[in-house]
Amino acid sequence: MNRQGDKGSVLSGYRVLDLTDDKGMLCSRYLADMGAEVIRVEKPGGSAKSPFSWENLGKRAVTLNIELEPGQEVFRRLAENADVLVESYPPGYLEALGLGYPRLSQINPRLVMASITAFGQRGSYRDDKSCDLVASALGGQMYVCGEAESPPLKPFGSQSYYLAAIFAAIGVMLALWHRHTSGRGQHVDISLLECVAAALDHVLVRYFYQGAVAKRQGSLYWSNAFRIFPCRDGHILFSLFQQWETLVEWLASDGMAEDLTDEKWRDRGYRLQHLDHIIEVLERWTKSHTVAELVEVGQLMRFPWAEVASISRILASPQLKERDFWVEVELPESGKRYKFPGAPVKLSRSPWRVGIDNNR
């Protein structure tokens, strides 16, 4: 079917209906960026304002009250000609309106419907109230974040929503691929809880195989291989054990190796047992240097070190600029142009379509 969409884009010619809140707006944004025609269905009187504008780049929008029969009839007609529906209502809500997958799949057997909910379409928690905080807590994310002596902490931002949106986009693409061979759509069930737990595979697998319970250890990486250290003018992500002899020689050249030149420290097991002492010595050393000094020389020595970049430093990143990561888009509600994150994935033959509908 010939529809709007950039020719050559991965999803050019596909139509997506968007019935999501902040749990799923990013999913349909990615589909729009890949060339799909995304129609966002909003309640009358409601519109997406900043900070959610960036999650709705490239989408068209219609207002429709799907709780009333006239709006439901219009939505069914939209679904009849759609390829994908992404929604994030509580389980059972759309079914009660006659807009659930069983009914819509009768109207359009090729429809792929992705539902992003707190706990999925079944299970004992299905109807429980939730949010990003709940998903982070129940999914184990909070348990492993924070200092050893502090209570569990939540990572910054709505991480469960971002994870769910990405997994949902993958699920939609897989369902569309399956439709090419089967001719039929299917229901993609996305659970925030499961998305968070899936992202903790390294923590869970260690427990399954070794019985090891992950502990909160601040900025120290779970494998003890990396840690964040303070410098004179910021912070650096620092590898602790790679090329140990080279690192100690560097400290010694600055007169700050202390006892790390002793033969006993060449043993990795000994270093792991006395990690606190190594951290103390390294911290005194990093505080004597700027971030740029350590990163520049460290990279020359092939250490995987990096500045812990502030927001302003991210915006000024030459790497992101050279790869055209940032896009400027004029928002219809204000007429002002703003900079937004662009495509995290670049395809050599299928360019992303970022924000093109916002300027029409």
Model segments located where?
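Short glycine-/small-residue-rich Rossmann-like dinucleotide-binding loops
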Residues: 21, 66, 90-91, 117-118, ...
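Active-site-adjacent "lid/gating" segments in soluble enzymes
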Residues: 30-34, 97-237, 241, 249
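A structured beta-alpha segment of the ubiquitous adenosine-cofactor-binding alpha/beta core
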Residues: 17, 55-106, 287
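Aromatic-enriched alpha-helical interface/lid elements that frame and gate functional surfaces
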Residues: 225-301, 305
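Flexible, small-/acidic-enriched active-site or ligand-binding loops
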Residues: 2, 152, 331-360
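Conserved small-residue-rich beta-alpha loop and adjacent elements
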Residues: 8-46
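Conserved PLP cofactor-binding pocket of PLP-dependent enzymes
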Residues: 297-320
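Glycine-rich phosphate-binding loop and adjoining beta1-alpha1-beta2 segment
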Residues: 33-65
